[in-house]
Amino acid sequence: MSRIGNKVITLPAGVELAQNNGVVTVKGPKGELTREFPTAIEIRVEGAEVTLHRPNDSKEMKTIHGTSRANLNNMVVGVSEGFKKELEMRGVGYRAQLAGNKLTLAVGKSHPDEVVAPEGITFEVPTPTQIVVSGINKEVVGQTAAYIRSLRAPEPYKGKGIRYVGEFVRRKEGKTGK
């Protein structure tokens, strides 16, 4: 049995869920998200509780069941609380600047890297070496943060680069001379 798929999703106050031919729309205080779900998965709303049911116990249905429940829960959490990923920059001269919705990064290249915020994503730069990516769609927040990190991933010898806050970067020893 899919343990994740069987968990009940509780709708917080102010969050509404509407479904139409497999397309589910979740509205909340932070915004609105729409996603298409497999038609085999039945979504039942009873008051403030949402449950997902699958037609049979085949392996494929179990995986779709758990994934659908996780996606729906992420939509509910996104429109009620939102998601954020924090990144930090380490290295001499590494810094970030924000101008409107465009993030300019100086990360040791001959040119600055510019990242334009996708729709629904906001950037914050509390200090020149910290970046906060936030929004209501968990997937887009994660993809945007991963793209920013990929512009200069942390290297193992000195640890320079862009990393997630709290990320452990495994360090290596340099070559030993004669």
UniProtKB/Swiss-Prot annotation:
Keywords of the record: Ribonucleoprotein, Ribosomal protein, RNA-binding, rRNA-binding
Gene Ontology cellular-component annotations: cytosolic large ribosomal subunit
Coiled-coil segments on the chain, per record: none
MF terms in GO: rRNA binding; structural constituent of ribosome
GO BP, sorted A to Z: cytoplasmic translation
Keyword RNA-binding on entry: yes
The keyword Glycoprotein appears for this protein: no
Subunit note: Part of the 50S ribosomal subunit.
Entry function: This protein binds to the 23S rRNA, and is important in its secondary structure. It is located near the subunit interface in the base of the L7/L12 stalk, and near the tRNA binding site of the peptidyltransferase center.
Similarity comment: Belongs to the universal ribosomal protein uL6 family.
Protein's UniProt name: Large ribosomal subunit protein uL6
Provenance organism: Streptococcus suis (strain 05ZYH33)
Organism phylogeny: Bacteria, Bacillati, Bacillota, Bacilli, Lactobacillales
Gene that this sequence comes from: rplF
